[in-house]
Amino acid sequence: MNTYASEKVVLHIEGDEWCPYMCDENAIKQKGLFRDITESIFNSQNYEVKFEFMPWARTLKRGEKGEIDAILAAFKEGREKFIFHKIELIQSLQSFVVLKETNWKFKNFNSLKDIHLGLILGYIYGGNIDQIKNNAKKISEIGGENGLEKNLMKLKNKEIDAVLDENHVLQYYIKKLDLSTSMKFTGNIGKRAGLYIGFPKVLPNSQKLADTVDKGLTKMKKSGEYQKILKKYGLTVKN
């Protein structure tokens, strides 16, 4: 965290491309739901948000060390080195996608024993990552940029049997890659879980920033701004 000469505080935030939540505005002219919310909250409190796309595993490591001011966006589970606000950005659902000709359907963790599953390095999938790894027949974790797009193409090419990711994000990239006619959703894992901005515990201002998010979200929901941003991205999620 640093300041301009005008004393505006600069927040350095990182995350991976995860549209419609975090989008590349140079490609689609929109920043994404979470980036819009984050900027609205902090810009109104004399902060300047500097956001950069990074592979998620790298973002986590940099966040844990306090090399950046925040990570966007994260589940709380398994993230003990971060401080989180109390009100979630959104409730998230993790879903499986397979090729349309595939008969497999997720029923419980035991059903994973039949598939080769594509995941993204560093993701915890709503806190279910240990049970997933303990039950799946085989797992391929992909790192680097555009991980979900790479996994969906691996599924298309039958290199893996299924892909697991956030429901709205899967919908976005399946449409983007024109894969709607060849893929289908086949079950959700666990319950809906909140997504949050994570602030490193090693940084002294993290609790203050988390409190700022809670106050900002409360204000945005009361004024209708939050709902307006949801609608902008075609989301009508209950929160």
Segments from the language model and where they lie:
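Extended ligand-binding regions for polar small-molecule ligands
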Residues: 35-44, 110-116, 123, 199-232
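Flexible hinge/capping segments at coil-to-helix
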Residues: 99-117, 132
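Extracytoplasmic small-molecule ligand-binding "clamshell" domains
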Residues: 6-82, 144, 223, 232, ...
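A bilobed periplasmic-binding-protein/Venus flytrap-type ligand-binding module shared by bacterial periplasmic
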Residues: 95-105, 193-208
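Ligand-binding cleft/hinge of the Venus flytrap
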Residues: 38-47, 87-89, 111-113, 122-145, ...
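Short Pro/Gly-enriched coil loops immediately N-terminal to beta-strands
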Residues: 15, 84-97, 111-113, 186-194
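Short loop->beta-strand "edge-of-pocket" segments that line small-molecule binding or catalytic clefts
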Residues: 9-23, 109-125, 218
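A ligand-binding cleft/hinge motif common to bilobed small-molecule-binding domains
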Residues: 61-64, 74-82, 161-191
